[in-house]
């Protein structure tokens, strides 16, 4: 099946796979029986972050299941949490196709999707149905602004989306770093970000995080850290996709959009280490270029409380979460670490 999907156009393959997973998600016993074989349930993997308990630190990054259609499948496949979105207050179709590209030689993807989604209200209905099933999957909700909303009114979009979705998320992420919505990254700059956080922080008592770009300078990252602390956010998600293209082999490397996967690995780790130096109690969620148990272990040791995957899962297939978590347990045993909680206390 995995090989068949790779023979299709990338966006068509994503749509087909997501449709099948959404169907499977609603099948009750057909979901729960395979979950017993796929999930790695081990108390050593449990994580506490921003007041939420996670069965393991490996999560599905935003972008895979924007509209919260296949949440049961992510639980059954072994993820410790899933982040839906990016969701905007109004539905939007996103950028013209083609807009998703596989760079197989680089184990990477380029996307310029443009926040295509069915809107916050529809996603809220899906999230409500999932919550009623009682499956123990912590959920993050990634929020963005509509393309046609001017920057000076961006906060209103985030607030509108949050009002629909606030009852159903365990934590919320403000996406101000996608390279595929014109002008959006300006919201990472001091004055815009200061105003945005000042308006969003009082809107929910639930954990609020900020997603940052890998292309920020150390000085800009420090400014983001300072504002995150000033407005009492609970953490940062680092990093989004990059505009950089160094060292790529694929003929598709010049396509416009955000690059994810293996080429992002080094920069994602650099940003994580920089943020960890000044985090001072903030939870850090690392994403970008995670492909192996060693990658996962490295992020946790560098200061991440949680780690997300997207492109690695696309290339690694449905057993990818299980392989990473079993490998993580072996690495913990080899280094004499009895629990991830112990690693955090150290």
From Swiss-Prot:
Gene Ontology terms: cellular component: cytoplasm; plasma membrane
EC number: 1.3.5.2
Location of this chain's protein in the cell: Cell membrane
Signal peptide: none
Positions contributing to FMN binding: 62-66, 86, 142, 175, 211, 239, 261, 289, 310-311
UniProt-listed Pfam families: DHO_dh (PF01180)
Catalytic residue positions: 178 (nucleophile)
GO biological process per UniProt: 'de novo' pyrimidine nucleobase biosynthetic process; 'de novo' UMP biosynthetic process
GO molecular function, one term: dihydroorotate dehydrogenase (quinone) activity
Membrane topology: Peripheral membrane protein
Residues the record lists as binding substrate: 66, 111-115, 175, 180, 240-241
Catalysed reaction equations from the record: (S)-dihydroorotate + a quinone = orotate + a quinol
Pathway: Pyrimidine metabolism; UMP biosynthesis via de novo pathway; orotate from (S)-dihydroorotate (quinone route): step 1/1
Alphabetized UniProt keyword annotations: Cell membrane, Flavoprotein, FMN, Membrane, Oxidoreductase, Pyrimidine biosynthesis
Taxonomic superkingdom: Bacteria
Alphabetized Gene3D superfamilies for the sequence: Aldolase class I (3.20.20.70)
Cofactors (names): FMN
Details of cofactor binding: Binds 1 FMN per subunit.
Alphabetical list of NCBIfam families matching this protein: PRK05286.2-5, pyrD_sub2
Similarity section: Belongs to the dihydroorotate dehydrogenase family. Type 2 subfamily.
Complexes and interactors: Monomer.
Described purpose of this protein according to its UniProt entry: Catalyzes the conversion of dihydroorotate to orotate with quinone as electron acceptor.
Protein name per its UniProtKB record: Dihydroorotate dehydrogenase (quinone)
